[in-house]
């Protein structure tokens, strides 16, 4: 038996005892599920652990299940080291939260930091729920839409997934109404369509889900750029260009009108000021001015 096999066997012994070797020496690897983390009963999923660090060995384990720890020799291609762990046929015992680690040959007891957790869920165990859209599966851009997942089965939790997205949304089921349990998923103002499915699960087995609902295609009509702006975005980003032209035209008209109004107001104030000064002059001065005016008029008559 080679030294490496013995070393990895020792690592496995530590895992069985619930004690990890020294970890966090290297950067954490990444853990992905192919084709995805939702796996139908009896199907197989590939968990790929990879890193740009040249790891010779990868370890995969399920949280709380040290006996399920797996070891693979890493493959190296184009500066990336990876290992593909085949999990299946999928059963309830294989569902759960997984993490992976990397290690190098010369220090097998020094593991990398753990990858981010990855939840593997088994589906297809119970009756499928129903999925509907309010006000309907076809909505205008910017219109609010709510998806409702319901079933006669007493599921504690409902899960909504969108095709092409890894993460799902979950809501607790509401009280029983008209013989059904339901959860509503508000999606907010619609911008892009997509295909949605929902699942049901029970509180004591969160990794075991029902069959998928029938797929629901949500279509968005109209130009998304004309949809309602979000509260954090200025309306000019999503507003109508024609409305912008009207604003510009109104501004062009207002500018000269404001200048003219200011000019007239200035003239009016000046006249008021001159009139006030005339009213405050002494009476004698006004008499002299009147006499001077008469003399000027007389002179003009004499010359005529």
Swiss-Prot record:
Q: Does the keyword Cell membrane apply?
A: yes
Function summary: Receptor on natural killer (NK) cells for HLA-C alleles. Does not inhibit the activity of NK cells.
Membrane topology term reads:
Single-pass type I membrane protein
- One GO CC term, this protein: membrane
Membrane-spanning segments: 246-265
Family from the record: Belongs to the immunoglobulin superfamily.
CDD domains noted in UniProt: IgC2_D2_LILR_KIR_like
Which InterPro entries does the UniProt record give? Ig-like_dom_sf (IPR036179), Ig-like_fold (IPR013783), Ig-like_Receptors_ImmuneReg (IPR050412), Ig_sub (IPR003599), Immunoglobulin_dom (IPR013151)
Q: Where does the signal sequence lie?
A: 1-21
Region ranges (Disordered): 220-239, 280-304
Q: Which residues lie on this side of the membrane: Extracellular?
A: 22-245
- Species name: Homo sapiens
* Molecular-function GO term, any one: transmembrane signaling receptor activity
**The protein's name in its UniProt record:** Killer cell immunoglobulin-like receptor 2DS2
Where the record annotates domain Ig-like C2-type, the positions are 42-107, 142-205
């Amino acid at each position: 038996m080679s030294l490496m096999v013995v070393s990895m066997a020792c690592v496995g012994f530590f895992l069985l005892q619930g004690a990890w070797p020294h970890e966090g020496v290297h950067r954490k690897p990444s853990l992905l599920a192919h084709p995805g983390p939702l796996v139908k009963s009896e199907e197989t999923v590939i968990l790929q652990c990879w890193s740009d660090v040249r790891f010779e060995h990868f370890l995969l384990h399920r949280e709380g299940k040290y006996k399920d720890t797996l070891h693979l020799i890493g493959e190296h291609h184009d500066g990336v080291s990876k290992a593909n762990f085949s999990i299946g046929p999928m059963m309830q015992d294989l569902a759960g939260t997984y993490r992976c680690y990397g290690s190098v040959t010369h220090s097998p007891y020094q593991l990398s930091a753990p990858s981010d957790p990855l939840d593997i869920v088994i589906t297809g165990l119970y009756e499928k729920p129903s999925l509907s859209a309010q006000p309907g599966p076809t909505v205008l851009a910017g219109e609010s839409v709510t998806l409702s997942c319901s079933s006669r089965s007493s599921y504690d939790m409902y899960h909504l997934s969108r095709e092409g997205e890894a993460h799902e949304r979950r809501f607790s089921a509401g009280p029983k109404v008209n013989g059904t349990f339901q959860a509503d998923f508000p999606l907010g103002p619609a911008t892009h369509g997509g295909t949605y499915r929902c699942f049901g699960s029970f509180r004591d087995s969160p990794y075991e889900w029902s069959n998928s609902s029938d797929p629901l295609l949500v279509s968005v009509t109209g130009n998304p750029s004309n949809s309602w702006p979000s509260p954090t975005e200025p309306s000019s980003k999503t507003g109508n260009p024609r409305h912008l032209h009207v604003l510009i035209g109104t501004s062009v008209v207002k500018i000269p009108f404001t200048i003219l109004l200011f000019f007239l107001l200035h003239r009016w104030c000046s006249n008021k000021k001159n009139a006030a000064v005339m009213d405050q002059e002494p009476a004698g001065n006004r008499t002299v001015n009147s006499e001077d005016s008469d003399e000027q008029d007389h002179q003009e008559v004499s010359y005529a």
